[in-house]
Amino acid sequence: SEMCIRDRNYITESGDNPNAFNTSLGLFAQYDTRDVTFNASRGIFIKAEAKWYPEWLGNTRRNFGRFTLTFDFYQKLWKGAIFAYDLYADFTAGTPSWHMYAKMGGMERMRGYYEGRYRDKRLVETQIELRQKIYRRHGVVAWIGGGQVWGTDKFRWDNTLYSFGCGYRFEFKNRMNIRLDYGWGVYGNQNLPWDRKRSSAFLFTASEAF
Protein backbone atom coordinates (compact mmCIF):
# COMPACT_ATOMS: atom_id res chain seq x y z
CA SER A 1 0.00 0.00 0.00
CA GLU A 2 0.99 3.66 -0.23
CA MET A 3 1.62 3.74 3.53
CA CYS A 4 4.04 0.86 3.25
CA ILE A 5 5.97 2.49 0.44
CA ARG A 6 6.48 5.71 2.41
CA ASP A 7 7.11 4.07 5.80
CA ARG A 8 10.85 3.97 6.48
CA ASN A 9 10.36 1.31 9.18
CA TYR A 10 8.56 -0.94 6.70
CA ILE A 11 11.40 -0.68 4.20
CA THR A 12 14.01 -1.31 6.90
CA GLU A 13 12.17 -4.35 8.23
CA SER A 14 12.02 -5.77 4.72
CA GLY A 15 15.83 -5.86 4.77
CA ASP A 16 16.31 -2.85 2.52
CA ASN A 17 17.73 0.61 3.12
CA PRO A 18 15.39 3.62 2.75
CA ASN A 19 18.40 5.64 1.55
CA ALA A 20 20.23 4.13 -1.39
CA PHE A 21 22.66 5.35 -4.04
CA ASN A 22 22.32 3.92 -7.55
CA THR A 23 24.53 4.51 -10.57
CA SER A 24 24.97 2.41 -13.68
CA LEU A 25 26.74 1.60 -16.91
CA GLY A 26 24.59 0.89 -19.91
CA LEU A 27 23.82 0.95 -23.58
CA PHE A 28 20.71 1.32 -25.71
CA ALA A 29 19.46 0.82 -29.25
CA GLN A 30 16.70 2.91 -30.76
CA TYR A 31 14.61 2.97 -33.95
CA ASP A 32 12.30 5.92 -34.60
CA THR A 33 10.13 6.77 -37.63
CA ARG A 34 7.61 9.04 -35.84
CA ASP A 35 6.69 12.26 -37.62
CA VAL A 36 6.62 14.23 -34.34
CA THR A 37 8.30 12.78 -31.27
CA PHE A 38 5.99 14.30 -28.63
CA ASN A 39 2.68 13.90 -30.51
CA ALA A 40 3.03 11.35 -33.28
CA SER A 41 0.35 10.71 -35.89
CA ARG A 42 2.23 7.94 -37.70
CA GLY A 43 5.35 5.85 -37.33
CA ILE A 44 7.07 3.41 -35.00
CA PHE A 45 9.30 3.91 -31.97
CA ILE A 46 11.40 1.08 -30.51
CA LYS A 47 13.93 1.43 -27.71
CA ALA A 48 15.84 -1.31 -25.90
CA GLU A 49 18.05 -0.37 -22.97
CA ALA A 50 20.33 -2.47 -20.76
CA LYS A 51 21.98 -1.18 -17.57
CA TRP A 52 24.33 -2.72 -15.04
CA TYR A 53 24.52 -1.49 -11.45
CA PRO A 54 27.73 -2.96 -9.94
CA GLU A 55 28.59 -2.55 -6.28
CA TRP A 56 32.07 -1.24 -7.15
CA LEU A 57 30.44 1.73 -8.89
CA GLY A 58 29.00 2.90 -5.58
CA ASN A 59 25.68 1.08 -5.44
CA THR A 60 24.59 0.36 -1.89
CA ARG A 61 25.59 -3.29 -1.35
CA ARG A 62 23.99 -4.20 -4.69
CA ASN A 63 24.86 -5.91 -7.94
CA PHE A 64 22.01 -6.03 -10.41
CA GLY A 65 21.08 -5.51 -14.02
CA ARG A 66 18.03 -3.97 -15.66
CA PHE A 67 16.56 -4.29 -19.15
CA THR A 68 13.72 -2.17 -20.52
CA LEU A 69 11.91 -2.33 -23.86
CA THR A 70 9.51 0.22 -25.36
CA PHE A 71 7.47 -0.34 -28.54
CA ASP A 72 5.06 2.33 -29.81
CA PHE A 73 3.01 2.33 -33.01
CA TYR A 74 0.93 5.16 -34.50
CA GLN A 75 -1.48 5.12 -37.44
CA LYS A 76 -3.92 7.65 -38.89
CA LEU A 77 -7.44 6.23 -39.25
CA TRP A 78 -10.02 8.71 -40.53
CA LYS A 79 -10.02 12.50 -40.53
CA GLY A 80 -8.62 13.76 -37.26
CA ALA A 81 -8.30 10.26 -35.75
CA ILE A 82 -5.11 8.52 -34.64
CA PHE A 83 -4.68 4.99 -33.31
CA ALA A 84 -1.79 4.64 -30.85
CA TYR A 85 -0.36 1.46 -29.30
CA ASP A 86 2.20 1.16 -26.52
CA LEU A 87 4.06 -1.82 -25.05
CA TYR A 88 6.55 -1.52 -22.20
CA ALA A 89 8.58 -4.16 -20.35
CA ASP A 90 10.97 -3.77 -17.41
CA PHE A 91 13.02 -6.74 -16.13
CA THR A 92 15.59 -6.79 -13.33
CA ALA A 93 18.14 -9.51 -12.54
CA GLY A 94 19.92 -9.67 -9.21
CA THR A 95 18.87 -7.80 -6.08
CA PRO A 96 17.89 -4.18 -6.75
CA SER A 97 17.31 -1.61 -4.04
CA TRP A 98 13.66 -0.86 -3.21
CA HIS A 99 13.80 2.33 -5.28
CA MET A 100 14.85 0.49 -8.45
CA TYR A 101 12.01 -2.01 -8.64
CA ALA A 102 9.76 -1.66 -11.69
CA LYS A 103 6.79 0.55 -10.82
CA MET A 104 3.29 0.29 -12.26
CA GLY A 105 1.08 3.34 -12.73
CA GLY A 106 1.68 7.05 -13.17
CA MET A 107 1.18 9.73 -15.82
CA GLU A 108 2.01 7.64 -18.90
CA ARG A 109 1.02 4.01 -18.37
CA MET A 110 -1.70 2.31 -16.33
CA ARG A 111 -3.21 5.72 -15.75
CA GLY A 112 -5.58 5.55 -12.81
CA TYR A 113 -3.06 3.81 -10.54
CA TYR A 114 -0.61 6.00 -8.66
CA GLU A 115 2.98 5.25 -9.60
CA GLY A 116 4.46 2.58 -7.39
CA ARG A 117 1.23 1.11 -6.06
CA TYR A 118 2.53 -2.16 -7.50
CA ARG A 119 6.24 -2.84 -7.87
CA ASP A 120 8.45 -5.88 -8.34
CA LYS A 121 11.37 -7.19 -10.37
CA ARG A 122 9.40 -7.76 -13.57
CA LEU A 123 6.76 -5.63 -15.26
CA VAL A 124 4.83 -5.69 -18.54
CA GLU A 125 2.31 -3.01 -19.54
CA THR A 126 0.39 -2.42 -22.76
CA GLN A 127 -2.29 0.02 -23.89
CA ILE A 128 -4.20 1.24 -26.93
CA GLU A 129 -5.52 4.76 -27.33
CA LEU A 130 -7.85 6.44 -29.83
CA ARG A 131 -7.20 10.16 -30.33
CA GLN A 132 -9.81 12.26 -32.12
CA LYS A 133 -9.63 15.95 -32.97
CA ILE A 134 -13.18 17.35 -32.80
CA TYR A 135 -12.99 21.10 -33.48
CA ARG A 136 -10.02 23.31 -34.25
CA ARG A 137 -7.71 22.99 -31.23
CA HIS A 138 -9.97 20.69 -29.24
CA GLY A 139 -9.79 16.91 -29.08
CA VAL A 140 -10.70 13.88 -27.02
CA VAL A 141 -9.10 10.51 -26.32
CA ALA A 142 -10.08 7.14 -24.88
CA TRP A 143 -7.82 4.29 -23.85
CA ILE A 144 -7.70 0.85 -22.30
CA GLY A 145 -4.66 -0.97 -21.01
CA GLY A 146 -3.41 -3.83 -18.92
CA GLY A 147 -0.32 -4.72 -16.97
CA GLN A 148 1.27 -6.90 -14.35
CA VAL A 149 4.25 -7.01 -12.00
CA TRP A 150 5.72 -10.22 -10.61
CA GLY A 151 8.89 -11.41 -8.90
CA THR A 152 10.13 -14.90 -8.17
CA ASP A 153 6.69 -16.34 -8.87
CA LYS A 154 5.54 -17.01 -12.43
CA PHE A 155 3.49 -14.73 -14.65
CA ARG A 156 -0.22 -15.42 -14.10
CA TRP A 157 -2.96 -14.05 -16.32
CA ASP A 158 -5.38 -13.82 -13.40
CA ASN A 159 -3.07 -11.29 -11.71
CA THR A 160 -3.34 -8.87 -14.64
CA LEU A 161 -4.63 -5.40 -13.74
CA TYR A 162 -6.52 -3.13 -16.13
CA SER A 163 -6.77 0.59 -16.74
CA PHE A 164 -9.19 2.59 -18.85
CA GLY A 165 -10.17 6.21 -19.20
CA CYS A 166 -10.85 9.25 -21.33
CA GLY A 167 -9.42 12.70 -21.71
CA TYR A 168 -9.55 16.15 -23.25
CA ARG A 169 -6.87 17.75 -25.41
CA PHE A 170 -6.19 21.40 -26.18
CA GLU A 171 -3.56 22.21 -28.80
CA PHE A 172 -1.90 25.34 -27.37
CA LYS A 173 0.93 25.16 -29.93
CA ASN A 174 1.24 23.31 -33.23
CA ARG A 175 1.19 19.56 -32.37
CA MET A 176 1.69 20.33 -28.67
CA ASN A 177 -1.26 19.43 -26.45
CA ILE A 178 -2.38 20.18 -22.95
CA ARG A 179 -3.57 16.85 -21.55
CA LEU A 180 -6.38 16.34 -19.05
CA ASP A 181 -7.10 12.66 -18.40
CA TYR A 182 -9.24 10.75 -15.96
CA GLY A 183 -8.21 7.14 -15.51
CA TRP A 184 -9.79 4.25 -13.66
CA GLY A 185 -8.10 1.14 -12.41
CA VAL A 186 -10.26 -1.95 -12.36
CA TYR A 187 -10.46 -3.54 -8.94
CA GLY A 188 -7.03 -4.44 -7.62
CA ASN A 189 -5.57 -7.87 -7.03
CA GLN A 190 -8.49 -9.99 -5.83
CA ASN A 191 -6.02 -12.44 -4.30
CA LEU A 192 -5.02 -9.79 -1.75
CA PRO A 193 -7.79 -8.78 0.71
CA TRP A 194 -6.21 -5.35 1.32
CA ASP A 195 -6.04 -4.53 -2.38
CA ARG A 196 -9.59 -4.71 -3.70
CA LYS A 197 -10.34 -1.00 -3.79
CA ARG A 198 -10.79 0.62 -7.19
CA SER A 199 -8.18 3.26 -8.02
CA SER A 200 -8.74 6.42 -10.08
CA ALA A 201 -6.90 9.65 -10.83
CA PHE A 202 -7.04 13.00 -12.65
CA LEU A 203 -3.93 13.73 -14.72
CA PHE A 204 -3.01 17.19 -16.01
CA THR A 205 0.16 17.83 -17.98
CA ALA A 206 1.57 18.76 -21.40
CA SER A 207 2.22 16.30 -24.27
CA GLU A 208 0.72 12.88 -24.85
CA ALA A 209 1.16 9.90 -22.57
CA PHE A 210 3.23 8.15 -25.25
Predicted segments, located by residue:
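Short, small-residue-biased leader/transition segments that mark boundaries at the very start
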Residues: 2-5
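Flexible, surface-exposed loop regions and adjacent strand-edge segments
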Residues: 7-12, 64-67, 100-108, 157-163, ...
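C-terminal outer-membrane beta-barrel translocator/porin domains of Gram-negative envelope proteins
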Residues: 13-18, 22-30, 34-135, 140-146, ...
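Outer-membrane beta-barrel "beta-signal"
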Residues: 26, 107, 166-180, 196-210
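Outer-membrane beta-barrel translocator/channel fold
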Residues: 89-105, 178-204
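Short glycine-rich, acidic/polar surface loops and turns
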Residues: 127-129, 163-169
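Short Gly/Pro-enriched loop/turn and capping motifs at secondary-structure junctions
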Residues: 135, 147-151, 173-175, 185-188
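Small/polar glycine-rich anion-binding or flexible loop at a beta-alpha turn
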Residues: 144-147, 158-163, 182-184
